[in-house]
Structure formats: structure tokens, C-alpha cells
């Protein structure tokens, strides 16, 4: 009986250690604010599948990368590959998530019907994310310049910090139109008057990737997240979020 009791205790202790290890597993993912809903849904599904807790950080890409440089706690950054490749951050792994698309979200009640209407006097305020810090701010200014509209409307452009801030201005009607990404646009389709896709040939393609920082511990949780992104469940989420 003594041997059996000892073996039973060893099994209990072993299971306890495994449970403690699993509970301690955590990932920290930082992402562009325009992909909050995508990251939230992916994180929820990943946690349900693995039991691993996911902490999420959002901001424009300049904010996100600056925080990653200052902190060793961030495991992944999800955002524009071109922007991330120009930073001093060192990455160990990369997984393509999808292609980001620029959308003009028109406020309810605005007279704007097409992007050619941007030059009309009835369009008084146009919001874009900061082009120096946010991917879709850069994409918006590229489009407006390549379309030959920038010089005519720049005095009516309101530059804000992030995509969600642009969204807030559109929903409140404080601007006539705002430039955001498709993922964000899908979330507000019932709160905007009109969503106009922007010609993808008039701005640099936006490839959204998940990059694992080299500073991230080589944990089972991190490896499992890369694998998870390639599953059918994750791909369905990504597709529904406009990527």
C-alpha cells in the first residue's frame, strides 16, 4: 500500500507541475491599432485551443515598435512587413497573415459619393492616420498624391494618431471621410454612410505579417502560435477580417 500511495503522489505532483507550466505560458502580441479586432479574435481562438494566455498591445506602428525596443516582454508584432523591416528590431521568424487594403470610410450624411468628390467644397474635413507613424496614413497620402488630389485638399486634411481615431471621427460625423484599413472598415460598416475601396495600384502594397522577435523565449507557446496561424480556423478569421 505504501508503494502505491507513493506512486499516486508522484503522479499527482507530475500533473500539478504540468498544469503550473501550462498556466505560466503567456504570449504578448503587439499590433497596429487597425488590426485590433483581428488580433483579439485570433488570440481568443488560440487561447481556447492551447490554454495559453495572450496579452495584447495596440498602437500605430511607430508606437508598437518603440515599445518593443524598450521592452523584452513582447513576443510577436503583427503589422506592415515593409515598415517592420526598416526598424532596428531583430526578428527570428515571420508568418504572412494577409494583404491590407485601404478604404475611404464616408460619414453618414456626407455628400461624398466617389473619391473624385474629395475636391468638392462640400467636403470640408478629411481624416487620415499619421503618415509618418501609421501604415495606412502613408498609404492614404500615397494614394492622394498619385491621384493628383493632395495639393487640392491638403489644407482640409486632419492628421490623427491611429486608424481607430480616424474611425471615431467618421462615426461622430466630425469629418466627411476618413482613410482606414478594410479590417477596421468592416467593423463599422453599419455606422458609416459609405465604404469606398481605394485603387490598390495607387499605393504601395501592404503585406501584413506576424514577426516573432528574437528576444522572445523559444517557448512551446510561441512555436504553437506560428502553427496556429496556418490552421483553417485562423485562416477563416483572417479572411473574415478582410485580409
Locate each region found by the language model.
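Positively charged n-region of N-terminal signal peptides that target proteins for export
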Residues: 1-6
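Bacterial N-terminal signal peptides
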Residues: 7-17
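Exported/periplasmic ABC-transporter solute-binding proteins
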Residues: 23-49, 55-57, 62-243
Amino acid at each position: 500500500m505504501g508503494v502505491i500511495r507513493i506512486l499516486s503522489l508522484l503522479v499527482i505532483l507530475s500533473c500539478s507541475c504540468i498544469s503550473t507550466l501550462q498556466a505560466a505560458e503567456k504570449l504578448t502580441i503587439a499590433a497596429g491599432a487597425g488590426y485590433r479586432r483581428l488580433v483579439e479574435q485570433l488570440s481568443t481562438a488560440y487561447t481556447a485551443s492551447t490554454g495559453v494566455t495572450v496579452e495584447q498591445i495596440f498602437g500605430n506602428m511607430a508606437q508598437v515598435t518603440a515599445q518593443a525596443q524598450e521592452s523584452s516582454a513582447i513576443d510577436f508584432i503583427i503589422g506592415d512587413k515593409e515598415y517592420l523591416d526598416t526598424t532596428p528590431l531583430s526578428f527570428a521568424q515571420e508568418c504572412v497573415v494577409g494583404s491590407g487594403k485601404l478604404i475611404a470610410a464616408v460619414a453618414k450624411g456626407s455628400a461624398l459619393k466617389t473619391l473624385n468628390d474629395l475636391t468638392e467644397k462640400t467636403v470640408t474635413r478629411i481624416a487620415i492616420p499619421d503618415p509618418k507613424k501609421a501604415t495606412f496614413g502613408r498609404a492614404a497620402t500615397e494614394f492622394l498624391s498619385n491621384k493628383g488630389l493632395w495639393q487640392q485638399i491638403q489644407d482640409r486634411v486632419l492628421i490623427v494618431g491611429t486608424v481607430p481615431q480616424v474611425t471615431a471621427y467618421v462615426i461622430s460625423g466630425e469629418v466627411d471621410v476618413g482613410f482606414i484599413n478594410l479590417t477596421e472598415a468592416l467593423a463599422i460598416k453599419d455606422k458609416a454612410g459609405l465604404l469606398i475601396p481605394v485603387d490598390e495600384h495607387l499605393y504601395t502594397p501592404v503585406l501584413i505579417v506576424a514577426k516573432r522577435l528574437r528576444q522572445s523565449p523559444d517557448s512551446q507557446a510561441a512555436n504553437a502560435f506560428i502553427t496556429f496561424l496556418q490552421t483553417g480556423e485562423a485562416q477563416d478569421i483572417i479572411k473574415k477580417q478582410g485580409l
